Swiss-Prot record:
Organism: Bordetella bronchiseptica (strain ATCC BAA-588 / NCTC 13252 / RB50) (Alcaligenes bronchisepticus)
Pfam families (UniProt xref): Flagellin_C (PF00700), Flagellin_N (PF00669)
Native organism taxonomy: Bacteria, Pseudomonadati, Pseudomonadota, Betaproteobacteria, Burkholderiales
Keyword Repeat recorded: no
Gene: flaA
Keywords assigned by UniProt, alphabetized: Bacterial flagellum, Secreted
NCBIfam families linked: PRK06819.1
Primary location recorded for the protein, binned into one broad class: secreted
Listed name of the protein: Flagellin
Length: 391
C-alpha cells in the first residue's frame, strides 16, 4: 500500500463499517422500543402491504363481531316482547274459555270482557313501544320488516333478521273511547271483535242462526215479523251500529254480514236484498281493526278461540325464528373471533418484533460500534507514519 497523506483508505473503511453498525444499532433499538419489525415501508415494503391488508380485515371483522352481537341483542329484545304478548294471549284465551261456559251471567261476561280489553290494549302497547336503538321492531307494518346485519369485512356479507308483519297477532288497534251498545235496553261494551258479542249473543255460522240468550225481549220484539221485514238488533252506537243481526219471527237470524275494507274500517251490510235498506252500512268508528289483520266478525267464543290460536301460532313462529337467528349469530361471532385470532397471528409474524433476535442484533452492533470506534482511531494514526520518512 502506498504511503500517502491526503487519502486515508483505512480510515474510510473503518468509518463506513462504523456507519453500518450504527445504522443497524439504531434499527434494533427502534424495533425494540416500538415492538414492530416494520416501522416504515423501507423496512419491508412487501411485508408492510400484506400486514396493512391483514389490519384492514382484522378491524373489519372485529366490527362485524360487534354487529353480530347487536343482532343478538335486537333479536333478544324482540323475542322478549313477543314472550309478553304470548302471556297476554294465553290469559285472553283462558278468559275466552271461561266466557264460553253457559253458567256465566251477563255481569260475569262483562267483567271478563274488561280484562280482555285491557290485555288487548297491552298487546298493542307492547307492539307500538318496543324499541331497539330507535327501531320499532314490532310496530304494525303493511309488509314484513327485514334488518340486514353486516357480519363480514366485505360487501354483501350480511345476515337478515326477518320480523313478520304483526297483523296476525295484533288483534286490533283501538284509539280513543269505544261507544256502548244497547240490546233490549241493556248497555254493553263494544270492543275487540270476537269478544263483545259474547255478552249478548251466541252464533252458529254453519246453520245461520242466532239466539239471544241475554236479550229475550229483542227476540220477542222480532216475533211475527216476516223475513222481508226483518228486525235489526245492533251493538254499538244506535246511530252508528257496529254489529247487527236480522231476526225473523222465530227469533233466529235470517242474515248478517260485517266486512272490512282496505283501510281497516268495518262496514255493515245485509245478504238479503229485501232487508238491505234496514241494515245500512256503518263505520266501526273509533275501534279500528289493524290493516291486514284478517279479522272478521265472530259471534261466539269458538271463533274467538280460533283467532287466538292463530295469533299464538304466529307469535310462536316468530319467536322460533328469532331464537334460531340468535343461535346463528352466536355461531357467527364464534367464527369471526376465530378468524380474527388467526389473521392477527399471521399479521404478527410479519410486522411484530422478535425480541430475542433484536436484542441479539442490538448487542452485536453495540460491540461493533465500540470496536469500530477503536479501530477508526488507530486508522487515523496511519498517516503519522509518513512523517518518519521526512526525518
Amino acid at each position: 500500500m502506498a504511503a500517502v497523506i491526503n487519502t486515508n483508505y483505512l480510515s474510510l473503511v473503518a468509518q463506513n463499517n462504523l456507519n453500518k453498525s450504527q445504522s443497524a444499532l439504531g434499527s434494533a433499538i427502534e424495533r425494540l422500543s416500538s415492538g414492530l419489525r416494520i416501522n416504515s415501508a423501507k423496512d419491508d415494503a412487501a411485508g408492510q402491504a400484506i400486514a396493512n391488508r391483514f389490519t384492514a380485515n382484522v378491524k373489519g371483522l372485529t366490527q362485524a363481531a360487534r354487529n353480530a352481537n347487536d343482532g343478538i341483542s335486537i333479536a333478544q329484545t324482540t323475542e322478549g316482547a313477543l314472550n309478553e304478548i304470548n302471556n297476554n294471549l294465553q290469559r285472553i284465551r283462558e278468559l275466552t274459555v271461561q266466557a264460553s261456559n253457559g253458567t256465566n251471567s251477563a255481569s260475569d261476561i262483562d267483567s271478563i270482557q274488561q280484562e280482555v280489553n285491557q290485555r288487548l290494549e297491552e298487546i298493542n302497547r307492547i307492539a307500538e313501544q318496543t324499541d331497539f336503538n330507535g327501531i320499532k321492531v314490532l310496530k304494525s307494518n303493511a309488509t314484513d320488516m327485514t334488518l340486514s346485519i353486516q357480519v363480514g369485512a366485505k360487501d354483501n356479507e350480511t345476515i337478515d333478521i326477518k320480523i313478520d308483519r304483526n297483523s296476525n297477532w295484533n288483534l286490533y288497534d283501538a284509539v280513543g273511547t269505544v261507544p256502548g251498545g244497547t240490546v233490549n235496553g241493556e248497555a254493553r261494551t263494544v270492543n275487540a271483535l270476537g269478544f263483545d258479542v259474547l255478552s249478548a249473543v251466541t252464533t252458529t255460522i254453519a246453520s245461520d242462526t242466532v239466539t239471544f240468550d241475554a236479550a229475550v225481549a229483542a227476540a220477542e220484539q222480532a216475533a211475527g215479523a216476516a223475513v222481508g221485514d226483518g228486525s235489526v238488533v245492533s251493538y254499538g252506537d244506535t246511530a252508528n251500529p257496529q254489529y247487527a243481526v236480522v231476526v225473523d219471527n222465530a227469533g233466529t237470524m235470517t242474515s248478517y254480514a260485517l266486512t272490512f275494507d282496505k283501510d281497516g274500517k268495518a262496514a255493515l251490510g245485509d245478504q238479503l236484498g229485501a232487508v238491505a235498506s234496514q241494515a245500512a252500512e256503518a263505520a266501526v268508528g273509533t275501534n279500528d281493526v289493524a290493516a291486514g289483520a284478517n279479522v272478521t266478525v265472530s259471534g261466539g267464543a269458538a271463533d274467538a278461540l280460533s283467532k287466538l290460536d292463530d295469533a299464538m301460532k304466529a307469535v310462536d313462529e316468530q319467536r322460533s325464528s328469532l331464537g334460531a337467528i340468535q343461535n346463528r349469530f352466536e355461531s357467527t361471532v364464534a367464527n369471526l373471533n376465530n378468524t380474527i385470532t388467526n389473521l392477527s397471528a399471521a399479521r404478527s409474524r410479519i410486522e411484530d418484533s422478535d425480541y430475542a433476535t433484536e436484542v441479539s442484533n442490538m448487542t452485536k452492533n453495540q460491540i461493533l460500534q465500540q470496536a469500530g470506534t477503536s479501530v477508526l482511531a488507530q486508522a487515523n494514526q496511519v498517516p503519522q507514519n509518513v512523517l518518519s520518512l521526512l526525518r
